[in-house]
Design a protein with these regions (language model features):
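C-terminal EAL-domain catalytic cores of bacterial cyclic di-GMP phosphodiesterases
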Residues: 33-52
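Active-site-proximal helices and loops of the catalytic beta/alpha 8
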Residues: 40, 44, 58, 63, ...
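Hydrophobic faces of well-ordered beta-strands that scaffold small-molecule active sites
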Residues: 4-6, 50-52, 140, 169-171
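The substrate-binding groove and active-site-proximal loops of carbohydrate-active enzymes
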Residues: 19-33, 65, 104-122, 137-147
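Aromatic-lined carbohydrate-binding/catalytic grooves of carbohydrate-active enzymes
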Residues: 1-38, 156-158, 164
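Aromatic- and acidic-residue-enriched segments that line the glycan-binding/catalytic groove
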Residues: 15-27, 56-99, 182-190
Length: 190
């Protein structure tokens, strides 16, 4: 065994955690940041890499970013158009009509081309991608990669490799990735 891949580990309100509540906090049921560092350190000592699942196409309805249920102390996009996260989401009729992953209302879809979102996930010094690599992860598996814009994937890959030159980036693509057409464009995964 040379690589350990984890399904989503970030705080969420479901058991599957594909409805991310906070990208910068490990779900308390799984441990804490200190546990994560120790696990990555021990894995590296044994010649293994740790790959995290990056769910960057959508967040949770009950998240610090959307906050439809008000469980977070931050002002989410569902609560106010003044939320720092409002531009991340595509509201058709705020607050109750918004784009969601495959029509599942508890998974509000994000606009991956939004500058604020890209900064938070990819570019900022403490961005999600860079932060977890710095804490010991070796790479990312991108959930529904065929639903992420090529430009987003390219920026994510570049930022990850700036942080860790041997960072591993894997994308979930259900069809033949060598000639995948998605949203009327040939994808450039390779």
């Amino acid at each position: 065994v040379t690589t350990i891949y984890f399904n989503p580990i970030f705080q969420a309100y479901s058991n599957h955690r594909y409805d991310t509540g906070d990208y910068k906090r490990i779900d308390p049921l799984l441990g804490c940041e200190e546990d994560f560092r120790a696990l990555c350190s021990e894995a590296a000592r044994r010649g293994m890499r740790v790959v995290l699942d990056g769910v960057f196409n959508h967040t949770g309805y009950d998240s610090r970013y959307f906050n439809a249920r008000g469980h977070y102390d931050s002002v989410g996009a569902f609560q106010s158009k003044e939320s720092p996260y409002f531009s991340w989401f595509d509201f058709r009729n705020w607050p109750n009509e918004y784009g969601s992953w495959w029509g599942i209302y508890t998974l509000p879809q994000v606009n991956e081309t939004d500058g604020s979102y890209q900064n938070y996930i990819i570019e900022d010094e403490d961005s999600v991608v860079r932060r977890w690599l710095r804490l010991g992860a070796s790479g990312w598996r991108l959930d529904v990669a065929d639903e992420l814009p090529d430009s987003f994937i390219q920026k994510l890959n570049a930022a990850a490799r700036r942080e860790k030159s041997d960072a591993l980036i894997i994308g979930e693509v259900w069809e033949d990735a060598s000639n995948k057409i998605s949203y009327s464009e040939r994808r450039r995964y390779f």
